[in-house]
Amino acid sequence: MTVILVLLTFITFLTIDHFYSRKRVVIQPAMQVAKRDALPRIAPSLVGGFRVPENVRYHPGHTWALSESPSLVRVGMDDFAVKLAGKVDSITLPQRGQWLRQGQKVCTLRRDGVAVDMISPIEGSVSDINEALAQNPELARKDPYGEGWLITVQSPDAKTNFKNLLAGQMARFWTEESAGRLQKKFPTFAGMMAAPALAQDGGVAVDNVAEQIPDNEWSALTKEFFLS
């Protein structure tokens, strides 16, 4: 039921965004940046204490996509995802050349023997993987929009894929909604002494969100928010 409500909320966001986009005179194309060997320094805005850079597109399962060329897209996990996942033991990435579908698994996080999948925001063939991240999963927590990227994808229909993702104000709404749901859930956890001090808009969320989640709740909670 929760997943259905989340998806209905996402569809509502897209409908509103489509309505307003029809009134715009100028349509801004997806931002292109330098190749992967010159990682951009993305200046993020803050929503509910979570970093939400404005020049990337977001899947509601908390992964992001950034256009590097008309068909090459870099993919990663957003700040909400890495804080909720916490310190993981490993991140399993797909193979180069593997075909991914938008909305299906892009990688697997493992913590204390429990696995949870992340969803791909884009469809296409895996061009490259972040081997440094596979060796050191902490990179994702330290720099989710930079050195902690997951993969790059050659997407023949990237333009259409990007239309299915959240950007700008819609991405901010979605992150705020996710942060609100997360706050409401903490009091329901058995044995929880107090909810984490998630900051309001403009603040910085605590980094140890995952550490305050009971082990027996972590898998279900991450799968709910990651839509996996």
Predicted regions and their residues:
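Contiguous, well-folded functional domains in the mature portion of proteins
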Residues: 1-228
